[in-house]
Swiss-Prot record:
Keywords, sorted A to Z: Antibiotic resistance, Methyltransferase, Plasmid, RNA-binding, S-adenosyl-L-methionine, Transferase
Protein name in UniProt: rRNA adenine N-6-methyltransferase
Gene3D superfamilies: Ribosomal RNA adenine dimethylase-like, domain 2, Vaccinia Virus protein VP39
Catalytic activity as recorded in UniProt: adenosine(2085) in 23S rRNA + 2 S-adenosyl-L-methionine = N(6)-dimethyladenosine(2085) in 23S rRNA + 2 S-adenosyl-L-homocysteine + 2 H(+)
Stated family: Belongs to the class I-like SAM-binding methyltransferase superfamily. rRNA adenine N(6)-methyltransferase family.
Domain of life: Bacteria
Pfam families on file: RrnaAD (PF00398)
Cellular compartments per GO CC: cytosol
Top-level taxonomy: Bacteria, Bacillati, Bacillota, Bacilli, Lactobacillales
Binding site for S-adenosyl-L-methionine: 11, 13, 38, 59, 84, 101
SMART domains: rADc
Catalytic EC class: transferase
Length: 244
C-alpha cells in the first residue's frame, strides 16, 4: 500500500492518562514479548517497554521511526523496524503477543495477516468501532473466516476525542485470542466455498430442501439472521455429511 495513504489514515493517542486507561484492559506481563504494529510517535511503545520483556515496533514512516527510537533510547528491551506491516514476516518458533493502533483503511488486511500468518497467542488492536462490530457479525464472511482461528471480543470503547487528528467515528479496543483451528487443512477450501455461498444466501446451492430443514434443526437454528459461530460450524458439518 502507498506509504502516504497509510500515513494519512493514522490517528494518534498521546495522552498518558488515556494510554494507561486503554492498557488496563490489555493483559500483559514482564515475560511477554510484544510486536507493536505502528509505533506512531512512541507513546504506546514507551508504556509497553516499561511493562513487557521485549517490544519490537513495526513502523512504515521513517520519520516516526526516528522519533520513537529517540524517545526510547534508554530502553534496551525495545527496537523499531522501518517496514510496512503487510510486508513483515512474523517470527516462527517464538512466543509473542501483538498490540497496535492500526490504520482504519487497512484494518482488514492487517487482521487477516495477523490471524493467518502470525502465531500470536493474543492480539490487542485499536480499530474503528463499526469495524469491530462487523468482526462479530456471523452474517459476514470475514467474521466466519477469522473465527475458525481466534475468539474475538470487544474490550472497551474509545472516544474519538482521545485521538489527534480527531477521526469522525469512535474506536474500540479488541482482542483476538488464538485457539486450535476449527477447520482442518483438508477442509479449508470447502469451508471457504461454503461461507461465500452462505453469506450470499445461495442456500439452494448448498442443501436440498429436506437437507436444509435437517441441518437447521440439528443446529437448533430458528433465525437465519441470528446464529452463533458454533451453529454455523454445525451447518458446515451437516453439509460435509450430505456431500460425502
Amino acid at each position: 500500500m502507498n506509504k502516504k495513504n497509510i500515513k494519512d489514515s493514522q490517528n494518534f493517542i498521546t495522552s498518558k492518562h488515556h494510554i494507561n486507561e486503554i492498557l488496563r484492559n490489555v493483559h500483559l506481563n514482564t515475560n511477554d514479548n510484544i510486536i507493536e504494529i505502528g509505533s506512531g510517535k512512541g507513546h504506546f511503545s514507551f508504556e509497553l517497554a516499561k511493562r513487557c520483556n521485549y517490544v519490537t515496533a513495526i513502523e512504515i514512516d521513517p520519520k516516526l521511526c526516528r522519533i520513537t527510537k529517540n524517545k526510547l533510547i534508554e530502553y534496551e528491551n525495545f527496537q523499531v523496524i522501518n517496514k510496512d506491516i503487510l510486508q513483515f514476516k512474523f517470527p516462527k518458533n517464538k512466543s509473542y503477543k501483538i498490540f497496535g493502533n492500526i490504520p482504519y483503511n487497512i484494518s482488514t488486511d492487517i487482521i487477516r495477516k495477523i490471524v493467518f500468518e502470525s502465531t500470536a497467542t493474543e492480539s490487542y488492536l485499536i480499530v474503528e468501532y463499526g469495524f469491530a462490530k462487523r468482526l462479530l457479525n456471523t452474517n459476514r464472511s470475514l467474521a466466519l473466516f477469522l473465527m475458525t482461528e481466534v475468539d474475538i471480543s470487544i474490550l472497551s470503547k474509545i472516544p474519538r476525542e482521545y485521538f489527534h487528528p480527531k477521526p469522525r467515528v469512535n474506536s474500540s479496543l479488541i482482542v483476538l485470542k488464538r485457539h486450535p483451528s476449527k477447520i482442518s487443512l483438508k477442509d479449508r477450501k470447502q469451508y471457504e466455498n461454503f461461507v461465500m455461498k452462505w453469506v450470499n444466501k445461495e442456500y439452494i446451492k448448498l442443501f436440498s430442501k429436506n437437507q436444509f430443514y435437517q441441518a437447521l434443526k440439528y443446529a437448533r437454528i430458528d433465525d437465519l439472521n441470528n446464529i452463533s459461530f458454533e451453529q454455523f460450524l454445525s451447518l458446515f458439518n451437516s453439509y460435509k455429511l450430505f456431500n460425502r
